[in-house]
């Protein structure tokens, strides 16, 4: 976290309070806020022409790295093969509406659709309400190119109840039709991190391991890229680079094959 950006955010809020009676750090939207970004991006994705190869740009934790987000957008826009961008949570740093707006203003310059999951930083203050207004549900799924993506909330520490992640919902989503060739789960906190609900870790990973055609579990949160099989159960977990590292993970998926590369920018 960079002190300069924190001071900028605080200064902006003070100026807004001085200049307008309308602004509150607790508000979930204003007249300039984008709405239903998930629905709009999914519509854009479904309108695109798919082929036998699915290409994903995967990154996470934008927080207050605005310059790095701009660099990411410029680089991805040069990658014509990319079908979809996945952002693994922590869109904001303090859950503030203005932070969400600053990041989405930049991400909306992408030439390809993007999907952003909710992170633990996004739940600070009124951030959950901001996310729901700006993006939509915290848990949802969609199918593209015979691949089912299951987007879900794993920010267990931010909730006092033990129902995050929502295991019954997740089990139902993993029970897929035969025409689905592969399943990719996307969330912020990985199950092997201390911020995940320890009481649900075993059931969560076993659910993935027992699901036919489960391909990948993608996460952010830990602020470094990892790729492996932490439970030795055949399930591959990948965590993203963060925006400040100026690199993203590029995944090419076709047939029963997966090719991963790291793209600097």
Sequence positions of predicted segments:
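C-terminal motif of bacterial Sec signal peptides marking the signal peptidase cleavage site
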Residues: 13-16
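Active-site neighborhood of phospho(di)ester-bond hydrolases with catalytic His/Asp-centered motifs
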Residues: 58-61, 84-90, 113-120, 152, ...
